[in-house]
Amino acid sequence: MEPHPASRQTPAWFWFAALFALILLSRLPFIGVEYGQEFDAWRVARAAQHIAETGEYETSRAPGNPVQEIVCSWIWRGGPWAINGASAFFSAIAATALAAVARRMGCAHWWLAALAFAAVPVVFLGSVNGKDYLWSLAFVMLSICAALRARPVSAGVLLGLAIGCRITAAAMILPLGVMLLGALPRAARIGGIARLVLATFAAGLAAFSPVLLRYGFGALTFYENLGRPTWKAAVTLGTLDVFGALGLLGMLIAVGGGCFRLLRRDPLPILQNALLTPALALMAAIYLAAYVRLPHQAGYLIPFVAAVILLAARWSPRPAFLACAGCLLVAPFVSISRDGLGAGCIFADHAQRVQNTASLRRFLEFAESLPGHNAIVVGAWEPQIAVLAPELLHGHNDYFYTLDEKELAPLLRAGRPVWFMPEIREFNLRVNRLDLAHYGARDLRLAR
């Protein structure tokens, strides 16, 4: 199947550049308000500032995402516009690389596949905050492009950079290996796979060297116990929070169309790489299984979304895929609920960021008015305080993310009043196995 008709008159690079610019521009109205609702995004900003000011590497959270943290340390003075803007930049790279893969698969609407992917709510939201999801995926998609061109060393280096942004990208070594098997002649397959593995290991090790030199290999096994949501919550997080109601409808249309096509046994364009479709299915299965194991954040499924969009572009009949893409393009801007149509997730996220910052400033005004030198456990607000008001973090009061026994004991010996936010008591118990109230800490509501 030929590319989009317009590309017959205009070089392909022009359409890729236009696609990149369009996706990047669509993010700009939403990147200037703080670093996002997820506190890990604030941790990235905090670590970037520390690295820039001290020259010493500090992870935002174990096991770290050193490529993102170090690059952000070069631009952190630009605030949300710079750090969120970098996420937007990498989201445009990821979508453009996805378009290149779709085009190589013979998809007539490869450009629409990229736009649909970029509009998936979880992707759009991830591209306007400080999280690492789209940084990693950009390098993953570029590594796929390299593998399809039978360039195992380039694919491995790019995958190593993806791992340096998000360690879970290491799982892509299997799908990339399958793609290389289909791209290389039989005699070159063993050597190609070996070069892929060695290049990935070398690049990944180099990317993670700041973490290993500072914290040792123990940092790679760290896991913060956030608890497991109910299955109902996990399903909602993995469906509606990923695609939105309209986007989920679109994906169901695409799946239905693909099943109908299989039943009719309609012919598909012959792929240059016969193993590309199985490799994408493997990619989707790996990241879906990883999410099922730890269903904490919808963003974990972003690589799954990329694979599924490509499979839909390949297998769905043209009307079904156009309907799917249309639903996805609208999904971040319009929501559907029992109350009817409403503002989409991207507008709700923007408003919630403004509200969260206002709430934090009101809280700090109250907390700083308390008498004495207090220790206050604030959970996710701790990195936000460190970024927005670093002079207050250890000033009149000390603000902590959580407290363990070693941290709590000297506070109690010094006679310091210890307070906790209402929802933090249970969180601290789950993470540190320590009930703050049992040791004399008090609910901050009692101070009002």
Where are these regions (language model features)?
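Hydrophobic/aromatic-rich transmembrane helices and adjacent perimembrane loops
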Residues: A162-C165, A171-L174, R293-P319
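Signature aromatic-anchored transmembrane alpha helix within multi-pass, membrane-resident enzymes
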Residues: P5, A12-A21, V157, V197-L205, ...
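Short acidic/glycine- and proline-prone juxtamembrane loop motifs at membrane-interface regions
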Residues: V128-Y133, Q297-A298
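Membrane-lumen/periplasm interface segments of specific transmembrane helices
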Residues: G192-G257, L288, V292, A331-S335
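Loop-to-helix entry region of an early transmembrane alpha helix in multi-pass inner-membrane enzymes
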Residues: A62-P66, I70, R77-T96, G126-N129
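Transmembrane signal-anchor helices characteristic of membrane glycosylation enzymes that use polyprenol
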Residues: P11-A41, F201-Y215, L288-A289, V330-S335
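Membrane-embedded, lumen/periplasm-facing catalytic core of multi-pass transferases
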Residues: A52, C327-L392, H396-F400, D404
